[in-house]
């Protein structure tokens, strides 16, 4: 059953069209030059990154990938400086995590009818740039395929609050809490207008638990949070794409360590080549380009044995789903 859309009140909070169009034009104008001369890696930063092992995990989680939609984008805008006419397939997915003490979702991504229910909240021309291909598998149907109902979910952890990581909340009970850093909530929900990639409708009426990253450095990341105190679910700081972007490092019951990196990158190609997104779309959707590039360096320096899954990396998401 399709619910009504998130309403005119939330659409009124979107950024006006003219400023968005001006940002798009500026980003487009900057893109050709960065195709020829991509941003150089910070070799000093790489040389000074310390790699600290994560704590030993005394518990493990079961992980299920819920692929909901796909889309495609030119490879040359996903990783600037890559001179290719090819398109890269991108995924949109939620991730079900079952811990001995809780069942939760990383990135409750999409609801059924997201094109009509959520995308109208975004300023023009953003919906034209980000809309997934149809059909879209709604979150409740994706969960039902694994015999799980929305009422079975204890809480959700969005890697950040862009629309395509939280729209599935419209299909979860209002009692399901959102856990995330307070700085992310303040950025997305403060002020008269939502940031360009944020739709506030799915977030309205929700309980938020502000989880601060007050734990020690882990791997190449400066701050962490051991969610259950057993090393199985660690939140790490991936600020840049948004002010409160986080990664979720899991100790999975197949023996692997999986890091969900949200939109810190859209593809592992960026990590391998140390490339940020092209100015279009990076200048439109990355809140702090310098911080985002620093985060890519931290991902590049990860040790072997960490499986990196960016939310839109179709190859990585599909490979994890097959395990």
Feature map (PLM): residue ranges:
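Cap/insert and terminal regions of metallo-dependent hydrolase folds
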Residues: 2-3, 127-141, 254-323
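Core dinuclear metal-dependent hydrolase active-site scaffold
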Residues: 63-68, 82, 87, 93-98, ...
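Active-site metal-binding motif and surrounding structural segment of the metallo-beta-lactamase
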Residues: 118-179
